[in-house]
């Protein structure tokens, strides 16, 4: 990391050369290269250039991290709450001191806009403050004794080593979701960021090393599934496995973890419905849908994947929605006036375009879209796209798009709408826009999702976030995240 006095100069140089150097793993309190010496070039989807050389973990590195995390847990769990909170406050201050480096790392590895990168960085700062305070608010319980001969106390103890396998779309926000509650509760953790966006997570490991955070409590590495996530899942050391990613990958993790009984926390794929009724606040509905749909280039698990619009307001909604979508400026987030960056890589863009082509071949009407002209080679930009006349037989209706494509379905009445809202394999987020309290009450119960947002959107570290069906188990954020890593133990 840069000395604080040199930080601004270092950031300026990095912006010019777009090179974050060799990023080492963080295992057992020290920065280290892979036992096998393997490195991987990390290509920015925004520039097409190599921005870092990443030390990639071997199976031996993963085994070492597991052993070090166990040692870290044995030390960390024995510290007092105040001692742990002092260390976490020191870590939070160090993150704030290096906020600019983290910010640019997220921008370059994802191509995010400045505002979108803010979501990542602000979340880790907030989480490292929220969870130590949440631990101070936690209370043990005295349970009644039927015979009157004992005093029964229910206390909360840390489970042990946590292994966290993370998605690429919010590289530091996802770290925040997992690290903050784990270390606040007295657990140690191994962070396995996605190989597609690992730079900022490795930089977080450097920050931990800089302040000499207790060895083994936080560990950061990534690599192939066979060398990292599978050994972690199959190991007998972890007591908690937690993941953010696709439903298909989550199912594999569940199967791999069966070598022992582990606590699982899974935040998986979504297929969020948004219901726009004829009595809605049109400004609020349009602005929220455009903001949600194209934020982070549509690569958000809670983004509205199916937007249902009542026929009596359809034309007005589409006119205003299209006008706002046309105004989105696509490019690299560091450039002035940019509203949306690229998708994560060319492979992801090809999949999105396959879903678009499938919909058009089955009768959908496509407007806008296409690959922007004049972008550098090896970049993965895609213009915002709108699909109308979408029907349930199209892949985009049933699969998570995870890209800047709005799929619109017109409906006449609630009787027409209701059979299309719920799907058998997903239930993460949903949105309802109406001024009818009766409708709000109906759909908050009818929609089979972990979250129902009404007339707007609100997410935060203090609000529980989780799904049902194949969209996951348990919750990130809020005090409920602690239930994953705590054992409630009667004494």
What are these regions (language model features)?
Residues 140-284, 411:
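Rossmann-like NAD(P) dinucleotide-binding subdomain of oxidoreductase/dehydrogenase enzymes
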Residues 15-150:
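N-terminal Rossmann-like NAD(P)+-binding subdomain of aldehyde/semialdehyde dehydrogenases
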Residues 240, 248-391, 454:
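ALDH superfamily catalytic-core signature
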Residues 73, 77, 92-99, 103, ...:
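Structural signal for hydrophobic packing residues in well-ordered secondary-structure cores
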Residues 87, 177-180, 185-196, 200, ...:
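Short loop-to-beta-strand entry elements in the cores of soluble alpha/beta enzymes
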Residues 1-14, 486-490:
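Single conserved hydrophobic/aromatic residue that forms the stacking wall/gate
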Residues 51-57, 72-78, 164, 274-277, ...:
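Short, well-ordered beta-strand elements within core beta-sheets of diverse protein domains
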Residues 47-53, 238, 275, 329, ...:
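Conserved C-terminal structural/oligomerization subdomain of aldehyde/semialdehyde dehydrogenase
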